[in-house]
């Protein structure tokens, strides 16, 4: 077959074009790889922000002792109002620490060592504190804890004033000497809870489960105990209240007057007993007490040397 000059030229011209386009394609691929690698290198070398560092430090507390920078990290997160939803801090040691005013929705705190921890004004919606978490002398004032779980938690002498914890689970928790005054615990489960010497002054306990709960010497002044499950007359008769502010109960339960105290001296005695429960709750776990966010070790008293005994401070909030 004969090939004309024009056809030969076309074949010759196609060869360098193919080579040219291959080179262009290879160059573009190489440039793309360089750009991607440069971006990744820049991203990895970018300085860690204070907030990112703080979150990393807080998360590192899981199942171990807290790092030295913990307090500063929490403060930075709080100041930035950064939410820590779904954070897992199970087994962390938060003894005497300040975790107030944080957003910790659906947080997992199972088995934490939280004696004396402060969660005041924090959002703990659906948080998990079950499985024998240590929370003696802890504080949850003004916290939002709807549907949270505190089953089997030790909470002796804890403060839950003005707390909103509707449909929460406190089953089998220890709340001896705890203060739940002015809180809303509607529909929560308090079955088998030990409430001895606790304060439920003006507390909304409607529709709660109180089956087998210990209500010995519990102040239920002005508390709403209507439609509770498991509350019988024998249990109610163990409670006490101000004659001027009896609790609200559902029939056939009857209010039998039993005052928690009849003078200021008796009132002070009751407060001292509650504070003693709080101190015992701390001492049994810490062998000491909380003071300004730190654990203060307190050895046993020496009868022959009272000058060496360490006094436990009592603030106006305690009594």
Where in the sequence are the language-model features?
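Tandem repeat scaffolds
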Residues: 3-8, 13-22, 42-49, 65, ...
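Hydrophobic membrane-insertion alpha-helices, especially the h-region
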Residues: 26-42
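Alpha-solenoid HEAT/Armadillo-like helical repeat scaffolds in large eukaryotic proteins
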Residues: 57-61, 92
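Alpha-helical transmembrane signal-anchor/signal-peptide segments
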Residues: 47-58
């Amino acid at each position: 077959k004969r090939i004309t000059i024009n056809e030969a030229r076309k074949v010759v011209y196609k060869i360098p074009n193919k080579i040219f386009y291959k080179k262009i394609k290879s160059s573009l691929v190489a440039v793309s790889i360089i750009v991607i690698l440069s971006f990744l290198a820049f991203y990895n070398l970018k300085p860690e922000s204070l907030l990112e560092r703080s979150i990393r430090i807080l998360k590192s507390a899981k199942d171990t002792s807290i790092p030295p920078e913990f307090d500063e990290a929490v403060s930075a997160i709080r100041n930035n109002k950064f939410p820590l939803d779904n954070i897992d801090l199970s087994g962390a040691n938060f003894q005497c620490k300040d975790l107030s005013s944080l957003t910790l929705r659906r947080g997992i705190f199972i088995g934490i060592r939280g004696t004396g921890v402060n969660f005041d004004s924090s959002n703990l919606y659906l948080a998990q504190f079950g499985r024998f978490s240590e929370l003696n002398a802890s504080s949850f004032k003004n916290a939002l804890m709807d549907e949270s779980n505190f089953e089997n938690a030790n909470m002796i002498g804890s403060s839950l004033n003005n707390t909103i914890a509707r449909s929460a689970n406190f089953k089998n928790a220890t709340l001896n000497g705890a203060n739940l005054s002015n809180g809303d615990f509607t529909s929560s489960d308090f079955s088998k809870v030990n409430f001895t010497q606790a304060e439920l002054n003006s507390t909304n306990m409607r529709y709660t489960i109180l089956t087998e709960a210990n209500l010995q010497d519990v102040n239920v002044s002005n508390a709403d105990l209507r439609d509770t499950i498991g509350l019988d007359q024998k249990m109610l008769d163990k409670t006490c209240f101000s004659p001027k502010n009896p609790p609200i109960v559902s029939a056939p339960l009857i209010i039998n007057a039993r005052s928690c105290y009849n003078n200021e001296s008796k009132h002070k005695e009751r407060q001292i007993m509650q504070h003693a429960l709080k101190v015992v709750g701390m001492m049994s776990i810490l062998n000491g007490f909380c003071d300004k966010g730190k654990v203060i070790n307190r050895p046993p008293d020496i009868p022959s040397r009272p000058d060496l005994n360490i006094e436990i401070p009592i603030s106006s909030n305690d009594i």
